[in-house]
C-alpha cells in the first residue's frame, strides 16, 4: 500500500525580510517577497508498505498538497504490485506515464518521494545503509562547507563567517540578496557582501555564491 500525509507547521515562523536571498522567480519587472520560495510550512510524508509489512519512507517539501494528489491519483496505481527491487523499472514507468505533464517540477517531486521510499525499503530488507546500495564509499573523507551566510548587515554577516572559521571550516557558501530586478546597484551590494566575507575568511579558502537562479 502507499499512504501520503501532509504535515503542517503552525508554530512561530521567521517574518519576511527584504533581500534575504534571491528568488528563483525574481523577474526584472516584478517586486516580490524575497523569502517567498523558502517557506516550507508543509511537508509531505510518503509511506510505501510491502506485503511483508516493511515500510519505506519518502518525503517532499515542494508543493506537498499537489504532490499528494499526484501520488494518490496517478502514481500509486502504477506502483502497487511491483517488486521494490525493480526500482529502475518502476521509476521509468512513473516517468513515462507522466511525460505529458511531468518530466520536471511537480511530476519529478512526486516520483522522487516514492523512489526514496523504495530505496528505504531495500535498505531495510538487506539490512544495509542505502549508500551501500548506491555504490558504497568512494573516498575516505568528504570535504564539507559552511552553508548559510544569508544577506544581512555586514557586521552581522562577518560575525557569522568568523564563527565558521573558528569551527575549522575552509569552504563557505553565502547567498546573494539582490537579483535581476535590483539591477546593477543590486549586484554592487552582492559584491560588497562577498568582499566583507572574504575579509574574514581570507583568500586561501573557497567561497561559493548561491543565486537561486
Predicted feature descriptions by range:
Residues 33-34, 49-125:
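Metal- or metallocofactor-binding catalytic centers and their adjacent structured scaffolds
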Amino acid at each position: 500500500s502507499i499512504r501520503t500525509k501532509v504535515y503542517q507547521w503552525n508554530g512561530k515562523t521567521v517574518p519576511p525580510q527584504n533581500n534575504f536571498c534571491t528568488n528563483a522567480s525574481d523577474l526584472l519587472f516584478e517586486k516580490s517577497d524575497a523569502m517567498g520560495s523558502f517557506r516550507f510550512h508543509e511537508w509531505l510524508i510518503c509511506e510505501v508498505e510491502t506485503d511483508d509489512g516493511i515500510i519505506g519512507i519518502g518525503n517532499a517539501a515542494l508543493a506537498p498538497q499537489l504532490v499528494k494528489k499526484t501520488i494518490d491519483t496517478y502514481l500509486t496505481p502504477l506502483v502497487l504490485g511491483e517488486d521494490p527491487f525493480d526500482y529502475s523499472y518502476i521509476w521509468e514507468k512513473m516517468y513515462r506515464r507522466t511525460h505529458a505533464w511531468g518530466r520536471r517540477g511537480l511530476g519529478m517531486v512526486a516520483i522522487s518521494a516514492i523512489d526514496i521510499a523504495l530505496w528505504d525499503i531495500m535498505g531495510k530488507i538487506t539490512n544495509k545503509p542505502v549508500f551501500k546500495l548506491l555504490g558504497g564509499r568512494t573516498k575516505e573523507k568528504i570535504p564539507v562547507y559552511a552553508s548559510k551566510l544569508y544577506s544581512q548587515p555586514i557586521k552581522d554577516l562577518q560575525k557569522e563567517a568568523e564563527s565558521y572559521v573558528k569551527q575549522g571550516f575552509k569552504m563557505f557558501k553565502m547567498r546573494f540578496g539582490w537579483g535581476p530586478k535590483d539591477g546593477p546597484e543590486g549586484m554592487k551590494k552582492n559584491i560588497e557582501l562577498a568582499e566583507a566575507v572574504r575579509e574574514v575568511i581570507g583568500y586561501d579558502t573557497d567561497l561559493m555564491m548561491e543565486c537561486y537562479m
